[in-house]
């Protein structure tokens, strides 16, 4: 008989919660400068120590057994707050820009496929997809059922077949992640290539990658997550050859493709 023994280095979590005063004291001990501790306490009560930790991290020693001491003696708590506020404004600008991209992508996919198939419910046609049909239908169904839009309620109250609303309704309410998955799952044909060209790209795979990357960035913005100095899970493909050149080869070669600037 073979006995399987699972080895683990995990330990119990024993850290205790800190009061606001203790949080200030902890940061002071590590070298952060406070000009007004009462004001800092108010910020910590509104923003949280843990959320701000992401903005102090780059200025601290962060080795395995380090004390997370600040590497510079001139970093003030106000500098961290300024960085946090900058990131918040940056997220707002990014989110507004993504809105334009998202609306354009939804519109083009729906219009091109509805027009070419003559089918209001074309997205239900399994023959249009190269993989992931069942999972995609589950995602679309869940997103539509979760929607509180009046036009979805109107369709459900008036029609019983097909059970799903037409593409211009259903794909209007699915998440951008679901929309990205739909585009990626579609078979490669002239319609998909045409949509890609509308965004100035020559390769469908690049638009698929961009939609996936933008979807991740959108989620960060929507959930108020840090975007400054973040390493994203999906690396962006930066093409050298586009319909409308926007960056020279040297610059492209210097960009870290899992950082915000690439997205």
Language-model features and meaning:
Residues 2-263:
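Long, contiguous internal "core" modules enriched in hydrophobic/ aromatic residues
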């Amino acid at each position: 008989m073979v006995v399987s023994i699972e080895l683990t280095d995990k330990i119990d979590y024993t850290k205790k919660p800190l009061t606001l005063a203790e949080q200030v004291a902890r940061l002071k001990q590590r070298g952060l400068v406070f000009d007004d501790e009462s004001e800092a306490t108010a910020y910590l009560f509104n923003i949280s120590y843990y959320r701000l930790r992401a903005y102090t991290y780059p200025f601290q020693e962060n080795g395995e057994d380090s004390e997370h001491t600040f590497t510079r003696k001139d970093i003030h708590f106000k500098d961290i707050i300024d960085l946090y506020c900058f990131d918040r404004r940056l997220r707002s600008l990014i989110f507004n820009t993504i809105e334009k991209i998202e609306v354009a992508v939804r519109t083009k996919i729906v219009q091109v496929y509805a027009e070419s198939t003559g089918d209001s419910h074309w997205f239900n046609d399994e023959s249009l997809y190269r993989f992931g049909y069942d999972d995609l239908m589950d995602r679309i169904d869940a997103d539509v059922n979760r929607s509180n839009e009046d036009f979805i309620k109107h369709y459900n109250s008036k029609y019983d077949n097909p059970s799903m609303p037409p593409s211009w309704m259903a794909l209007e309410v699915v998440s951008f992640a679901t929309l990205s998955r739909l585009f990626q799952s579609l078979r490669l044909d002239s319609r998909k290539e045409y949509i890609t060209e509308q965004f100035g790209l020559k390769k469908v795979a690049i638009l698929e990658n961009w939609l996936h990357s933008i979807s991740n960035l959108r989620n960060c913005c929507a959930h108020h997550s840090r975007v400054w100095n973040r390493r994203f899970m999906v690396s962006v493909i930066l093409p050298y050859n586009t319909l409308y050149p926007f960056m020279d080869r040297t610059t492209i070669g210097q960009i870290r493709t899992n950082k915000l600037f690439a997205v």
